[in-house]
Amino acid sequence: MPDLLVPLYRLPPRETGAASVRDKGVILRRANPFEQTPVGAFIRTHFSAGWAEETAVTFARQPITNFIAIEDKKIIGFAAFESTRKAFFGPTGVDPAHRGRGIGRALLVESLWGLHDLGYAYGIIGAAGPVEFYRKSVGAIVIPDSWPGVYADLLR
């Protein structure tokens, strides 16, 4: 899975982020420091303990570099950035029961605007799975010879 490069100076409008899912009853916002436990539990339940650990560092940053999607006071998605490495987006995920509603794209856009607001010109999507989704959504391009990149020699 290659890394992708995203030019943050050509992002879709901010309105395609949180505002795009609000009318669907989804609140998309930054996580709060006191929400680390429920966010971590959501990630462990729906994705992996490794992702929960990788995302934990976002709660030590100011502002927190983790957006969450909430519906009926339940977390249904998350997107971390500045977690794996500087300027990296991810990990990210949406509860399988809530996919196909634009939530993942909204989380992506909000997070990339978050990187932009931190002063980066480019963002990196590490070990991107759905390359075509990222290309269509934010103009991401494959970084040649980027696998395994920062994911080489991981402890398991």
Where are these regions (language model features)?
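Short gly/pro-enriched beta-turn/loop segments at secondary-structure junctions
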Residues: 21-24, 34, 61-64
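Catalytic cores of nucleotide-enabled group-transfer and carboxylate-activating enzymes in metabolic
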Residues: 36, 69-74, 81-82, 92, ...
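Conserved acetyl-CoA-binding loop-helix of GNAT-fold acetyltransferases
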Residues: 94, 100-113, 136
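Acyl-donor-binding surface of acyltransferase catalytic domains
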Residues: 1-22, 127, 139, 148-150
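Conserved hydrophobic beta-strand within the GNAT/NAT acetyltransferase core sheet
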Residues: 89, 123-127
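A short beta-loop-alpha structural element at the N-terminal edge
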Residues: 27-38
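Conserved active-site alpha-helix within GNAT-family acetyltransferase domains
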Residues: 1, 105, 117, 128-154
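A conserved beta-strand-loop-helix scaffold within acyl/acetyltransferase catalytic domains
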Residues: 41-96
